Amino acid sequence: MVAPPQLRALLFAINALLSKRRYHAALAMLKGFRNGAVYGAKIRAPHALVMTFLFRSGSLREKLRAILQATYTHSWNLARFVFLYKGLCALQSHVQGKTYQAHSFVSAFIGGLLVFGNNNNINSQISMYLLSRVLFALCRLGVEKGFIPEPRLDPFPWFSGLVWGLVLWLFEYHRPTLQPSLQSSMTYLYEDSNVWHDLSDFFIYNKSQPSK
């Protein structure tokens, strides 16, 4: 099917605009917004689907609404953050005439305050997800730069043992300090497995099904 001349002219004009170097920073912000929205939806929707149907009570409509709300919030926040981060980086580079490493930190710091500063479940999950990876990366950077002696043996087994020891101790004795979705997951694993009445809720279901 051949596109009408008006559509071909429009596409030609858009592609010509996209190829102009002078608009690259602004266009990169727009594409960053697009990619943030898509990526946020792709990673949040499956997670929200599983967590909602595993742990949330309520009608099907309420569950679907919760899934859509969580997906929208994650997607919208990530899109705004990428847009703001790229814009602030471009602005600093333009003002100072070149790019410095500090630009990334300053831009992301401001974006984090403005976009992810609201203390809710989704922002909390995202920040904690990043925290674990930041700590790992900083340890590796410390070894790379010589600030931390390179270990002779792989420290990962000790790290894993420490993490699991701490999280189960917190769950058993200081549960309110843990993030709600982690509490739900650990309750399913370590508390619900202590209770059963017959084969149905021992093997087939987690909890007894209400009689109709």
UniProtKB/Swiss-Prot annotation:
Glycosylation sites: N206
Predominant subcellular localization, coarse grouping: membrane
Parts of the chain that traverse the membrane: 97-117, 153-173
Membrane topology reported for the UniProt record: Multi-pass membrane protein
Keywords, ordered alphabetically: Glycoprotein, Membrane, Peroxisome, Transmembrane, Transmembrane helix
Gene Ontology cellular component list: peroxisomal membrane
Pfam family, one: Tim17
Highest taxon of source: Eukaryota
Location relative to the cell: Peroxisome membrane
UniProt record similarity statement: Belongs to the peroxisomal membrane protein PXMP2/4 family.
UniProt subunit comment: Interacts with PEX19.
Name of the protein in its database record: Peroxisomal membrane protein 4
